[in-house]
């Protein structure tokens, strides 16, 4: 009987531990959901620990149990963005022709950026996620590295197929990324509307088509 009682107690303890772990994960997800809503609707300035706590009816102290500061929350949100974008890019590896895949990756990247301008800024422009990495003394930007590796792998395969002869791998990858990022950033920042550009409503699409012509001839 003692053995049975001990076994039941152990099972109950394990069940309680698992339940508490699940509750913690659910509350952490709730905090991030509230933070993302605030960030997208009201901007980084209004995405404060206090406002996040108020929006989910929890104390500020509860939020601090899960996140050390605002920058950690913003870093977690930026990671969510990379999971979303990375998932869309990985699907394209079903495209066997690496050049066609490279072209499709650019379109997916641009579409994601223009459809999610606030998240795009957080992922690629705002300093908060990088400041968090500095705070915890982490040198590598894992999310950026993973995305860059998807691009690098595709460009390597393009080179193996005979494209980009005479070009250096990483500088070329960085050039491709920079050009597409620039298109997204200028459009998101409303820099294309009043710059005396013809057909500004289509300029990103038209510019990307021109970019594809250029890289196809490299």
Residue spans for each PLM region:
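Hydrophobic alpha-helical connector segments
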Residues: 90-118, 172-176
């Amino acid at each position: 009987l003692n053995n049975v009682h001990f076994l039941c107690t152990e099972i109950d303890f394990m069940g309680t531990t698992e339940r508490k772990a699940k509750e913690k994960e659910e509350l952490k997800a709730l905090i991030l959901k509230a933070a993302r809503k605030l960030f997208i609707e009201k901007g980084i300035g209004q995405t404060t620990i206090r406002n996040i706590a108020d929006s989910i009816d929890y104390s500020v102290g509860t939020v601090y149990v899960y996140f050390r500061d605002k920058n950690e929350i913003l870093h977690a949100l930026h990671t969510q963005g990379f999971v979303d974008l990375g998932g869309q890019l990985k699907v394209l590896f079903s495209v066997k022709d690496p050049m066609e895949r490279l072209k499709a990756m650019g379109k997916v990247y641009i579409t994601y950026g223009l459809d999610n301008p606030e998240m795009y800024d957080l992922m690629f422009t705002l300093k908060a996620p990088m400041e968090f990495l500095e705070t915890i003394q982490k040198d590598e930007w894992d999310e950026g590295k993973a995305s860059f590796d998807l691009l690098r792998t595709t460009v390597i395969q393009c080179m193996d197929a005979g494209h980009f002869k005479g070009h250096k791998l990483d500088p070329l990858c960085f050039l491709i990324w920079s050009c597409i990022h620039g298109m997204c950033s200028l459009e998101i920042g409303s820099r294309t509307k009043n710059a005396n550009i013809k057909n500004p409503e289509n300029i990103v699409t038209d510019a990307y088509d021109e970019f594809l012509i250029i890289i196809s001839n490299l």
